[in-house]
Amino acid sequence: MASAAEGDMEAELTRGLLWGFQDLSLNKLATSLGASEQALRLIISIFLGYPFALFYRRYLFYKDSYLIHLFHTFTGLSIAYYNFGTQLYHSLLCIVLQFLILRLMGRTITAVLTTFCVQMGYLLAGYYNTATGTYDIKWTMPHCVLTLKLIGLAMDYYDGGKDQKSLTSEQQIYAIWGVPSLLEISGFSYFYGAFLVGPQFSMNHYMKLVRGELTDVPGKIPNSTIPALRRLALGLVYLVGYTLLSPHITEDYLLSDDYENGSFWFRCMYMLIWGKFVLYKYVTCWLVTEGVCILTGLGFNGLDEYGTAKWDACANMKVWLFETTPRFTGTIASFNINTNAWVARYFFKRLKFLGNKVLSQGLSLLFLALWHGLHSGYLVCFQMEFLIVIVERQAASLIRDSPVLSRLASITVLQPLYYLAQQTIHWLFMGYSMTAFCLFTWDKWMKVYKSIYFLGHVFFLSLLFILPYVRKVMVPRKEKLKKME
């Protein structure tokens, strides 16, 4: 009887322990936080960068380069496996293909074009084969980061074969003069501080890290702990805020009957608030990963004029500008900085032969839309960005050149009202653009746009055609002649 009772107790205890472990599973934890298991894995993986960075600082700084490349490759592959399982083969395959392209085709335009077609083609095929009606965290997420890295690598390698005098000062900084090995390309690609969500950085910058050059104290480990912790702390603030508010400010509500039946002004205000809030998940990830990059030294960006170390080489966010700017161009300049810099360096500036800056900008935004995915919402979002930036520049130029508008804009007592009006317009139409980006399928974003009567398109297309006529009336002829001269 006693043994039977003990057996029952053991069975009960085993069931209790199993239930406890199940209760502590990632899925249950994610559910309790209002997130998906994949999202929780992503956050855990990003934070894992800190112990990896500490290990690197303690044991590998100034060690043999092959050890550092192996460490970065192993940790990056581990993160890939933890998040995507055996689907990590996609990144491995593209890295090996890129190595072969560079070795077999050399420093040729053929290698650059082949790289662009192969890497972008693979990414777009991945988008096509994994597409669903909702946003999912899958292997294509880090792969889009990798795609830009490998295309940039091919272009820098190509520049390294040119006469140095024919390169711009920027191209000379990034040009690769040596021949990267497979291990070097792997370490560069899988670096744990940027593999999942960025930021973008060049092979040359990565190799400076490996050689121990990215430090404010030559010959010693960088004094980057405090700057890294500051970015981590700021990232945690955004993470807590997003976690607490995300159950109450959702994109699903935009599709609900409750939203559609609300007043027009309510629909606009909800879109404004949601448009600001939805970006915080990206801000969180980039601030946390920036802290990892700073901790390793990758974030070192030289010294300022006072001899103080700058740690913004991997900054993907200018938080103060992001939170305070009343302009769309200000948000663009403060958000996803390194990706925007990559597009400017490797795409926009390389289209100079077209002789048309607006066309180059439009093609760059089209590339960004395709890079994000094949859904129509991405195209609509970046089309709106293109339109808004053009109109904003027209409006700024009109106010600057018109004596009447310039005097009105300079009235101090009215500055708070101007700022409030600008911020309202700014974030309302940021939310309008982000609606297509986040809902991304035709039926979803079209439903929301119909509910607010395509306000963003009507407002900015109207201004695009009206502002030139307003300029003729408001800007004196002498100002126009002076500008032409």
Swiss-Prot record:
Motif Di-lysine motif positions after renumbering to this chain: 482-485
InterPro entries from the UniProt entry: LPLAT_7/PORCN-like, MBOAT_fam
GO terms assigned for molecular function: 1-acylglycerophosphocholine O-acyltransferase activity; 1-acylglycerophosphoethanolamine O-acyltransferase activity; 1-acylglycerophosphoserine O-acyltransferase activity; lysophospholipid acyltransferase activity
Topology in the lipid bilayer: Multi-pass membrane protein
Residue stretches spanning the membrane: 35-55, 82-102, 108-128, 139-158, 176-196, 232-252, 283-303, 362-382, 420-440, 448-468
Pfam families assigned to the protein according to its UniProt record, in alphabetical order: MBOAT (PF03062)
Broad EC category: transferase
Domain of life: Eukaryota
Pathway involvement of the protein, from the record: Lipid metabolism; phospholipid metabolism
N-acetylalanine sites (modified residues): 2
Record-annotated active site: 336, 372
Keyword Transmembrane helix: yes
UniProt record similarity statement: Belongs to the membrane-bound acyltransferase family.
Name of the molecule in the record: Lysophospholipid acyltransferase 5
Organism annotation: Bos taurus (Bovine)
Gene this chain is encoded by: LPCAT3
